[in-house]
Amino acid sequence: MPHPLLPDLETLATKVAASKGFALCGIQLLTHMSPMTLEVQIRHSSGADVSLDDCAGFSGVLGDALEASTLLTDAYVLEISSPGIGDQLSSDRDFETFRGFPVEVHHRDKDDSEQRLEGLLLERDADTLQINIRGRIKRIARDCVIGVRLTSPGS
């Protein structure tokens, strides 16, 4: 069950993030820690990488907003980070960045049954996703792709 303060903290963090050109990716209040810890994950609204300086700058601004709000009355630690790289590929940038990496493609075939294929990511264009499966190129219609995720080599 989430902490009762979490919705208010999320609203505050979302507003502060938007005012600084960030989007809130996640927030957790870890009350089992001493002092409790508020973990906040941000990303740039533009999609640019989040730097350590971005996290430090946002920490100061959000810390001031938290103090002014008096939502957290006990001692707490504020941790700001970026979400890092997830294993799901979604943006064009993801597909460019991870070209040549091992992926698992979850898709629907011609009979509308779900299939999973593993191979090396070659390319994604407006119409197809291409992967290399043991030296053979497999083209999958983009509208049949359910999801693409990074895998470990040989997994």
UniProtKB/Swiss-Prot annotation:
Q: Name one Pfam family in it.
A: RimP_N
Tell me where in or outside the cell this protein is found.
Answer: Cytoplasm
* Principal location listed in the UniProt entry: cytoplasm
Q: Which InterPro entries match?
A: Ribosome_maturation_RimP, RimP_C_sf, RimP_N, RimP_N_sf
GO cellular component, as recorded: cytosol
Keyword Cytoplasm assigned: yes
Any single GO BP term: ribosomal small subunit assembly
Record keywords, A-Z:
Cytoplasm, Ribosome biogenesis
Entry superkingdom: Bacteria
Q: Which family does it belong to?
A: Belongs to the RimP family.
What is the recorded function of this protein according to its Swiss-Prot or TrEMBL entry? Required for maturation of 30S ribosomal subunits.
Q: What is this protein called?
A: Ribosome maturation factor RimP
